[in-house]
Amino acid sequence: MYDISKWKHVFKLDPNKELSDEHLEMICESGTDAVIVGGSDGITIDNVLHMLVSIRRYAVPCVLEVSDVEAITPGFDFYYIPSVLNSRKVEWVTGVHHEALKEFGDIMDWDEIYMEGYCVLNPEAKVAQLTDAKCDLTEDDVIAYARLADKLLHLPIFYLEYSGTYGDIELVKNVKAELKQAKLYYGGGISNAEQAKEMAQYADTVVVGNIIYDDIKSALKTVKAVKGE
């Protein structure tokens, strides 16, 4: 079984976006630690299954980040369940999760499931608008969410999500200093190897997403930049 605590670099693929077979092979054979399948809108069981079957041709670990209960399917190595801690809507903190447990709780393999405490920091991002996230946060606010995830809820992952814009490296550094057991994931705005390397100084896991669809060569260079191999 894979050890997610050792993952330094992951690619995130959106099932609602077009990706050629050639580029998918490049991603899966890049040396990244895992591929996460997830997105904010247009997620269906059909496009999730298509992505799963495509990725399963390769040896890379595969994770489904669940944003729609209707699109859950067996076959992934792990399932990440996001809880948007700074959402104004309880459904995105625990509501959807409660519904999922009502429907699937009896058949869940709990060894495959990890809860993510999300803090969304770009108000323009789809995920911020979907979840009505309160993004105008001070550093103290963000650190309080990190403590909530790490020390009160004992979540395995705290995820700083800048989605579409590059984040504040000092904030990432200070959040990392607060976490004792939760792993820090960083995602958002990484468009080159230099940015990926900078965030990897403090984030346990760097998530690279949108650049895959804009500049595949730059996306691939982030693997070596983060892992130093």
Swiss-Prot record:
PANTHER family: HEPTAPRENYLGLYCERYL PHOSPHATE SYNTHASE (PTHR40029:SF2), PTHR40029
Function statement: Prenyltransferase that catalyzes in vivo the transfer of the heptaprenyl moiety of heptaprenyl pyrophosphate (HepPP; 35 carbon atoms) to the C3 hydroxyl of sn-glycerol-1-phosphate (G1P), producing heptaprenylglyceryl phosphate (HepGP). This reaction is an ether-bond-formation step in the biosynthesis of archaea-type G1P-based membrane lipids found in Bacillales.
Name this polypeptide is given: Heptaprenylglyceryl phosphate synthase
CDD domains: PcrB_like (cd02812)
Top-level division of the source organism's lineage: Bacteria
Residues of the signal peptide: none
Organism in which the protein naturally occurs: Bacillus mycoides (strain KBAB4) (Bacillus weihenstephanensis)
Family named by the database record: Belongs to the GGGP/HepGP synthase family. Group I subfamily.
Family annotation (InterPro entries): GGGP/HepGP_synthase_I, GGGP/HepGP_synthase_sf, GGGP_HepGP_synthase
An example Gene Ontology molecular-function term: heptaprenylglyceryl phosphate synthase activity
Gene3D superfamilies: FMN-linked oxidoreductases
Enzyme nomenclature, EC number: 2.5.1.n9
Binding site for Mg(2+): D14, S40
